[in-house]
Structures are given as C-alpha cells and as structure tokens.
C-alpha cells in the first residue's frame, strides 16, 4: 500500500522539478510513464500556472482577451502561437500583451502579419478580433511563408497571390491569387463585421479546407483544395492605428 504522505511528497517534488523545465522537456516527461502523464495532463496544475505566470505578459493575463482559453496550459499554448514580431510588415509592431498587433499610420501602405507557428497536419482553430477600424480593406485568413507582408497602396494584400487565402471583412469577399473567389458567407444580406466581434478561423489540414465561424455560427467552408504546405494564421490591414488580436484555440470542437 502506498503511504499517502510519501505520495504527497513525491507529488510536491515533481511539481517543483517540472516548474524549472522548459516546455519541450515537459512534453517529453509526459511520455515517460502513466503517472507523469496524468500529473501533467492537469492543465490547471501549479506547474502550468507557474509557467503561465512567468512567461505570459502581465497585460495579457489581466485582460479579457484570453477568455476563450480557460486553462493555464491553453493560455500558454496560445501565447506561443501568437503573432510573430519577426514575421510582419515594418509598419506593424506587436503590443506588450503579445497577442495584439498595431498598424502604424503609414500612408499608401498595406501591411500584414503572420503567426509564429504554421500548420501542415491536423485541425486547428484560432480567434481573430479586429479591435480598431477596418478601413477600406481588412482581410483575415492564412498564408505560406512566401506571401508578401507589405505593398504600396490600399489593397487586399492577403489573397493577392497564390500563396495566401483571405476573407475581406469589409466587402464579404473571398480572395486568392488576386481574384475574388465569391461572396462569403453565402447568405442573403449577410451582416457586415462589427469591430470587436470574435471570428473563429478553422484550418483543416487533413481535409485541406479553411472555414470561419462568427458568434458560434458556422459560416461554411470558404476554401477547398489547400496545398500540402505549412500555412500560417495571417491578416492584412490598411487603417492607421488599427489593432488586431489573435488567440490560438487548439483543435476545434465539432458540433
């Protein structure tokens, strides 16, 4: 019979040790044995709380931005999937919260940003929240690493080439390879996007499709036949001082 005091002691020791390991090591530890896997599977444990509080910016933890990711582990995961400060237009910077981009007021420029991590396998979902004016063009979607992140003028940059796919929220049009692929969503008098609404983007790399949800309503498949390439969450914007946040959610829930 296991001594409960000894078991608690082992639990506390593991907690301390795991708090000092990096995330890659924690992933490997979860595969060592059933006990460690069970221990680390608690997404609100003190281990994940410690890593979350030490790695996430305080601005993010204090805001309402992460309400869709309820556990410490999912908040931490969302942070590592957020906008990349090294993969965006020179006219864009990532705010201290780590999740929100800010487009500087530069005339005659369209500017884009990509997430830190792209996907080639599996199913993935993330939320995009446009927190400032849309301007004449505001596009959300995906791109490969080869898609441009800045161009002259006010245009739909995301979707302007064969390396990107986007939904222009201003005109409710789908864009790819420089062409309008049709209206979206396929509804009569589809409502326009309202600033602050959360749009859920769903990338299915197994089925090669991109879809969107708004207000928990599935809007339909937007793009089919996506290539077998690593695809990144991306947005492009034209309005000066507008801001766009992105929160990675993980595997989408069906139904």
Swiss-Prot record:
Identify the InterPro entries for this entry. B30.2/SPRY (IPR001870), B30.2/SPRY_sf (IPR043136), ConA-like_dom_sf (IPR013320), F-box-like_dom_sf (IPR036047), F-box_dom (IPR001810), FBXO45-Fsn/SPSB_families (IPR050672), SPRY_dom (IPR003877), SPRY_FBXO45 (IPR035784)
| F-box domain mapped to chain residues | 3-51
List, alphabetically, the GO terms of the cellular component aspect.
neuromuscular junction; SCF ubiquitin ligase complex
Protein localization: Synapse
PROSITE patterns per record: B302_SPRY
| Alphabetically ordered keywords of this record | Neurogenesis, Synapse, Ubl conjugation pathway
- Identify the CDD domains for this entry: F-box_FBXO45 (cd22111), SPRY_Fbox (cd12907)
Q: Which domain of life is it from?
A: Eukaryota
For the keyword Membrane, the answer is: no
Of which family is this protein a member? Answer: Belongs to the FBXO45/Fsn family.
**How does this chain assemble?**
Component of an E3 ubiquitin ligase complex composed of hiw and Fsn.
Q: What is this protein called?
A: F-box/SPRY domain-containing protein 1
The gene from which this protein is expressed is: Fsn
